[in-house]
Every structure is written in structure tokens, then in C-alpha cells.
């Protein structure tokens, strides 16, 4: 009985310590990284995208699932407790969609870090705030996909087809009661920093500031997101 009681006490103590550590780590996380739900790494072929990330980071992304009717599928690698890297590409198992696939996948020649997605628990408030700041995020839409284990994830998000500042301005997502995808994504990588470049940095920065996002934009020859990530292969910059 004493041994069993001690075992329960130790288990509870470890659980409390784990929660405390997670809270402490979250408190140390820069504000921008706390806002990031996921980064979108678009690829013309999902297997190519998965192998590219594995070579760069040393982490092999786990299968995410299909996006029914959109002609796409994804794979995921966690970047933190509630953030992840989404590798998304065409799904050959689905019929070709009536319109173009999202994120310009049909024209994409090689994998690239295309855009990012911000967390929100009140999408309507975000859209209203954005509109007041002169930023049109588009409509709030429903989304869903089925994981390989059969669990269906549902979410709401602002229109991902709305392109602002060449995709440096994110769309926003609310997972509601669905489990966060990072919970079942491949582990081993950590997002350290996200920054951006643009030929007209002031224009992009104005929109990001209107949304209260801390992403900094510097002058560059083309629009680009640059993520600094720590992984088994060391620190890398992903573009």
C-alpha cells in the first residue's frame, strides 16, 4: 500500500513538474512565436517536400491527412508545444479540383516556405480589427481533414486564398475543440525565429502592425519568409 501511494505521489509530482516546465518555457517564448500556429511549406510533390525537410532538419514529418475536395494532403513536424511545420502538396489520390489548388501548388517548381498561420480564439474580432486597420482578411471559413488514425480535425480560418503582401501577412486559425496537430506531429525541431523580406517592406510592415503581429520585415529582392529552426542537424534557415 505504501509503495503504491508513493508511486501515485511520484507520478502526480512529475506531471505537475512537467506542466510547470511547459508554462515556464511558454513564458520565455518571444511574443511572435507564441502567435504562430504553423508555417506552410509548399511543395509540388509531398514526398519531395518530406525528404527535403528531413535532409535539412533531420526530422521526418509524419503523415497529416487529406484535404477532401481540395486536391491536397500534408505531413507535419512539430516546432514547439502548439506550433508545427505543415508540408503541403498535391494529392494524387484525389480527383483534380475544379479550380486551382491552394498556395499556387499547380505552378510551384520547387519546395519553399510560402506563408504562415496565426492563432486566434476569436476570428470575428480579428477580421473586424483588420478591417479597421485597412486589411481585408476575407471570409471566415470551415475546414476539416481526417488523420490516418481516423480522427477528424475541424477548424475555422480566415480565407487562405486571400494573398496580402505576397503571403507575408498570415491567415488566422481557430481549432476549436479539435486536438492541436502538433500533438501528433514528428518531434525534434524547435522554431527559434521567424523574419521576412520584401521589396516594399514598409507596405508589408504596415499591414502586419495593423494586426498586432510582431513579424519584422526588412528590405529584400523578393518576398520571403525565413524561419530559423533548431533540429538534430543543427540550426538551419528555411526559406
Sequence positions of predicted segments:
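N-terminal secretory signal peptides that target proteins for export/translocation
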Residues: 1-4
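Bacterial N-terminal signal peptides
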Residues: 9-20
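Boundary at the C-terminal end of the N-terminal hydrophobic targeting segment
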Residues: 20-26
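Charged, alpha-helix-forming regions
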Residues: 30-31
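Vicinal oxygen chelate
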Residues: 35-45, 73-80, 85-89, 99-200, ...
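Amphipathic alpha-helical segments
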Residues: 45-60, 129-131, 200-211
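Glycine/small-residue-rich interface belts in oligomeric ring/scaffold proteins
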Residues: 48-103
Amino acid at each position: 500500500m505504501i509503495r503504491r501511494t508513493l508511486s501515485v505521489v511520484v507520478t502526480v509530482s512529475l506531471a505537475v513538474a512537467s506542466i510547470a516546465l511547459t508554462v515556464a518555457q511558454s513564458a520565455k517564448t518571444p511574443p511572435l512565436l507564441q502567435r504562430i500556429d504553423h508555417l506552410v511549406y509548399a511543395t509540388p510533390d509531398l514526398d519531395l517536400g518530406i525528404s527535403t525537410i528531413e535532409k535539412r532538419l533531420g526530422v521526418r514529418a509524419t503523415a497529416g491527412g487529406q484535404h477532401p475536395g481540395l486536391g491536397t494532403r500534408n505531413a507535419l513536424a512539430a516546432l514547439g508545444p502548439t506550433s508545427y511545420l505543415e508540408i503541403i502538396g498535391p494529392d494524387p489520390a484525389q480527383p483534380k479540383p475544379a479550380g486551382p489548388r491552394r498556395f499556387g501548388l499547380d505552378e510551384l517548381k520547387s519546395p519553399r516556405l510560402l506563408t504562415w498561420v496565426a492563432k486566434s480564439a476569436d476570428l470575428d474580432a480579428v477580421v473586424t480589427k483588420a478591417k479597421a486597420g485597412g486589411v481585408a482578411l476575407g471570409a471566415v471559413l470551415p475546414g476539416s481533414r481526417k488523420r490516418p488514425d481516423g480522427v477528424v480535425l475541424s477548424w475555422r480560418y480566415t480565407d487562405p486564398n486571400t494573398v496580402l503582401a505576397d503571403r507575408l501577412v498570415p491567415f488566422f486559425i481557430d481549432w476549436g475543440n479539435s486536438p492541436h496537430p502538433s500533438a501528433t506531429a514528428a518531434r525534434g525541431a524547435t522554431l527559434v525565429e521567424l523574419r521576412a523580406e520584401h521589396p516594399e517592406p514598409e507596405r508589408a510592415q504596415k499591414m502586419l502592425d495593423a494586426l498586432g503581429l510582431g513579424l519584422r520585415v526588412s528590405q529584400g529582392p523578393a518576398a520571403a519568409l525565413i524561419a530559423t529552426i533548431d533540429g538534430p542537424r543543427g540550426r538551419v534557415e528555411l526559406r
